[in-house]
């Protein structure tokens, strides 16, 4: 039996929900579906929120996984194929998600003849540009974040591109088969940063969704391993604002509810921030996930990750006020698209490009000259 609803005050964090980059990506995908002929795909999940993904799929926007990537890249008409079949395979649009992709993936899609809609977050684009620039100058690049996150995997590709540029600056160019001594490391915490090899010069960039505290700790550890370290400010202000708003909300409530996708990096960081307050804290993706125990508190604060749509926030707030779950807000988990790992997407595309030059696929975890690697 559900406990009596004792919630008297529900307070939203001052800043919560969709950030500008996610809102832009969703609108671009919906615009593509409304105005482009043929199939519309997103390359991997557009955002890490199951409700948003289900809504996009209901509108005819499919999530492309690695098993179907070859179809997107190479879709020649079969001999004797009917005209409508040719049109169905060639009139296709691929939307690059907010997290971005490696440049070789983008180039492979363009060569395939697909119409590419680039919905990469502008802040992520800036990180890509800076990472490529540092590598082109011959600096090693250290990325602070989740090594399997799409944003990090994409930025690694820009480090490869920058290292290739560094090659062109060598007198007479690089010898055949030789690549510049530019290495890229992905570190997920200060402990991994402290295990970096000793480096002369390197640049440190953050995944846009990590907390400032995490980044500061990683930077401090990296300074003990790098003689000359450039620390770039690449954390998204929207992420920092949501975390600050949650901290400001905490003293005024008895419990916290964070709304967002379980696989969303920014939502997980928000959840971590909430738990640091020592208040009872729960993560919910939709109304059905609201825990009965929360109704025992009289004052509840709510926040939401940057990929959480407004409609879900409103539905959860309504359910907290009424003690019930509105049927209209429910989305079946069976309707969610299959989510594939970002590295698999990147690997599938790079293998289609070929192994020559900077576009060669690199095994995750390997660290070698001009290799994208991870400190374990």
Swiss-Prot record:
Binding site for isopentenyl diphosphate: 48, 99, 149, 264, 266, 307
EC number(s) recorded for this UniProt protein: 1.17.7.4
Keywords assigned by UniProt, alphabetized: 4Fe-4S, Iron, Iron-sulfur, Isoprene biosynthesis, Metal-binding, Oxidoreductase
Gene3D superfamilies xref list: 3.40.50.11270, 4-hydroxy-3-methylbut-2-enyl diphosphate reductase, catalytic domain
Cofactor, how bound (note): Binds 1 [4Fe-4S] cluster per subunit.
InterPro entries on file: LytB/IspH
Residues of the active site: 151 (proton donor)
Protein residues bound to dimethylallyl diphosphate: 48, 99, 149, 264, 266, 307
Top-level taxon: Bacteria
Metabolic or biological pathway: Isoprenoid biosynthesis; dimethylallyl diphosphate biosynthesis; dimethylallyl diphosphate from (2E)-4-hydroxy-3-methylbutenyl diphosphate: step 1/1; Isoprenoid biosynthesis; isopentenyl diphosphate biosynthesis via DXP pathway; isopentenyl diphosphate from 1-deoxy-D-xylulose 5-phosphate: step 6/6
Cofactor(s), names only, from the UniProt record: [4Fe-4S] cluster
Entry binding sites for [4Fe-4S] cluster: 19, 121, 236
GO molecular function terms noted in the UniProt entry: 4 iron, 4 sulfur cluster binding; 4-hydroxy-3-methylbut-2-enyl diphosphate reductase activity; metal ion binding
Entry-linked HAMAP family: IspH (MF_00191)
Protein family according to the UniProt entry: Belongs to the IspH family.
NCBIfam families named in the record: ispH_lytB
Annotated function: Catalyzes the conversion of 1-hydroxy-2-methyl-2-(E)-butenyl 4-diphosphate (HMBPP) into a mixture of isopentenyl diphosphate (IPP) and dimethylallyl diphosphate (DMAPP). Acts in the terminal step of the DOXP/MEP pathway for isoprenoid precursor biosynthesis.
Protein name: 4-hydroxy-3-methylbut-2-enyl diphosphate reductase
Source lineage: Bacteria, Pseudomonadati, Spirochaetota, Spirochaetia, Spirochaetales
């Amino acid at each position: 039996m559900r406990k009596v609803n004792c919630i008297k005050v529900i307070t939203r964090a001052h800043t919560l929900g969709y950030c500008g980059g996610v809102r832009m990506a969703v609108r671009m995908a919906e615009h593509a579906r409304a105005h482009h002929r043929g199939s519309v795909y997103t390359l991997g999940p557009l955002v890490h929120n199951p409700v948003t993904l289900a809504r996009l799929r209901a509108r005819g926007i499919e999530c492309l996984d690695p098993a179907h990537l070859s179809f997107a890249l190479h879709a020649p008409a079969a001999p004797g194929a009917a005209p409508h079949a040719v049109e169905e395979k060639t009139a296709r649009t691929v939307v690059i998600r907010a997290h971005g992709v490696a440049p070789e993936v983008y180039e492979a899609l363009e060569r395939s003849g697909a119409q590419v809609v680039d919905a990469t977050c502008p802040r992520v684009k800036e990180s890509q540009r800076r990472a490529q620039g540092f590598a082109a100058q011959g600096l090693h690049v250290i990325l602070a974040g989740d090594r399997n996150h799409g944003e990090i995997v994409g930025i690694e590709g820009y480090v490869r591109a920058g290292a290739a540029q560094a090659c062109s600056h060598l007198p007479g160019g690089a010898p055949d088969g030789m690549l510049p001594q530019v290495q890229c490391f992905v570190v997920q915490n200060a402990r991994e940063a402290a295990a970096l090899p000793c480096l002369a010069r390197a640049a440190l960039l953050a995944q846009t969704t990590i907390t400032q505290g995490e980044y500061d700790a990683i930077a401090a550890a990296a300074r003990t391993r790098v003689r000359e370290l450039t620390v770039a400010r690449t954390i998204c202000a929207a992420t920092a604002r949501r975390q600050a708003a949650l901290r400001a909300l905490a003293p005024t409530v008895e419990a916290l509810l964070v709304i967002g996708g379980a696989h969303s990096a920014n939502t997980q960081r928000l959840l971590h921030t909430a738990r640091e307050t020592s208040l009872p804290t729960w993560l919910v993706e939709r109304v059905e996930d609201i825990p009965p125990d929360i109704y025992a508190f009289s004052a509840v604060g709510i926040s939401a990750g940057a990929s959480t749509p407004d409609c879900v926030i409103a539905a959860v707030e309504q359910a907290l006020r009424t003690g019930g779950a509105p049927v209209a807000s429910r989305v079946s988990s069976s309707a969610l698209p299959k989510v594939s790992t970002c590295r698999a997407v990147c690997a599938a595309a790079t293998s289609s490009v070929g192994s020559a030059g900077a576009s060669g696929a690199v095994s995750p975890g390997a660290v070698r000259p001009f290799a994208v690697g991870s400190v374990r």
